[in-house]
């Protein structure tokens, strides 16, 4: 346990936030003990890889740093494999390990920063795959009571970049382990346009997809170790077919992708780019020159500067297109 700890090294925006009390958690039993020791009514903050969060200047009370490790093969019938993974494991390292073991399904999600425990919260996705496609169950502990729970795929309520864990009903849970079901004989998933354009028919192998995904991400997204960022700062808006028909009357070239039955997903990057935001810099935060959906730090060390630029971008998109943008990273602490 460390009191008055700086969190700069624990978030990829490199924000100069601090925690009143920081505790590294390495087991679910320790987690439950820490929760039991909290003052009545106290709710801890939780940090994982810090790659999809915006930390406000000071986090009062207790902040738990999730460091539960471990990979355990629960079952293996030579086709399907079920693996239980600690929430504190590196996401990318886990993906690469699965690939080398011949456990397929996650290669398209390679090089996404963060931890295994953060993957279900956001329902991370890339290049035509979402992590929900490979999750069997999520194990968690109640933030206030220490109660254990195992949430099924249905319980998790996965949607585009969303899950029950981002809402009141699920935010009470702290994820400790995730059970994945992977497939030794899974077909290659290379239908996403960016990925398909990179690969020839002769290269439609799991090895080629993994290499291509890593290469594309390195080309398109800045390394957070060098340039503070959280990847995509906004979700791609999901709107009804009726709304896209109206939008296309004035903006026929807006990129559209399938989402669900009567909804489509539109490119937030395109909306932002068309309004001239690329390269714009304010108070130490800049819209990337290479990707309008990525905000980069160039001196800003507080959440306020990031949130202010994001709010201005969202307001301009709302005014121009009557489309609402949602932040992809979660804000932790009280923004002020």
Describe every region a protein language model picked out.
Residues 1-145:
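Anion-binding (especially nucleotide phosphate/pyrophosphate-binding) glycine-rich loop
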Residues 2-3, 8-15, 53, 148-296, ...:
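Phosphate/pyrophosphate- and phosphate-bearing ligand-binding catalytic cores of soluble enzymes
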Residues 34-40, 193-195, 309-313:
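Short amphipathic alpha-helices in soluble, non-transmembrane regions
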Residues 40-43, 314-321:
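A common structural junction motif
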Residues 301-317:
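His/Asp/Glu-rich mid-to-C-terminal helical/loop segments that flank catalytic regions of hydrolases
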